[in-house]
Amino acid sequence: MFPEEMYAIVPDALDAATCDRLITGFAHEMDDGGLVQGQTAAHIRRSKITWFNEEQEPVVSRRIIDLVADVNRNVFDFMLTDFAEDAQIACYSGDQRGHYDWHSDVGASDVARRRKMTLVIQLSDPDEYEGGSLQLNPAGHVFDAPMTRGTAIFFPSF
């Protein structure tokens, strides 16, 4: 059942109005996102991040839960037991040389070491910025994920 490509793409996971609302609604809450295994590592990650939960965004959270359940059922078949982390919004600003270097999404904390699946949704319109490619390297083949606004990209966290 596990896909040979080791990723799944869902176009139109969020509409443009929802993407805009998330960007503007959380822009004032951004903090430095350069932590890697609890330490600042700007050579690996330079970004601004914030988090939101189901209370703050019930409709978006429900959509994410439904997407994860559907993709997992039809593509990955992981044994998922919970959503142990809030959703993260990240901003990689060109004037700050924003980036996130190659990494896996499994971390050292109790929660991060249990991660099985990562979901990225492109909130920005790709015509509004340069760069910003999400590259995956499943099975040793680099793949540029689609940058279409509202598109969800799923991949194993490990």
Summary of predicted features, one role per range:
Residues 1-152, 158:
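Fe(II)/2-oxoglutarate oxygenase catalytic core
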